[in-house]
Amino acid sequence: MVAILHADVEAEFIGHMASALLARPEAYADSVMVRNRVPTETTSDPWPASKRLIVVRDDGGPTTQDVRATARIGVRVWAATEAETSDLALLAAALVRGWRSPVVRRTEPTRPYSVTEESRRPAAYFTAELTIRGRALPTA
């Protein structure tokens, strides 16, 4: 059996989402921080001034007998208001739904839902399953 190397799904998501949002005309798509962890809110790692943040988490997933795998991701979205958070989360889910690349072959996002927590910052959450394509690991 050939060893298969799969891409870093979080890095792929961050690159895709950040560039896709830059191309969008909606005001709530402007100045969105996209990363794989929540800021610590220290001087060196502040919450974004725009209050717009998208955080992705790779939740793993099974591989197949060929070069494919299923990557499950969780996506959290924050913005200044409940309405803006909802709009940004719906846009992010749509951008995931349309995402195709040499690595990502198919996506199935869920609909976002509100998950505002103790911080009182408006937040939403959705998940997606991605069919990703790996490549044969070169021999050493």
Language model features by range: what are they?
Residues 1-62:
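Small/polar-rich, solvent-exposed N-terminal microdomains that initiate assembly or binding
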Residues 83-88, 137:
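Short, conserved charged micro-motifs
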Residues 93-102:
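A common structural junction motif
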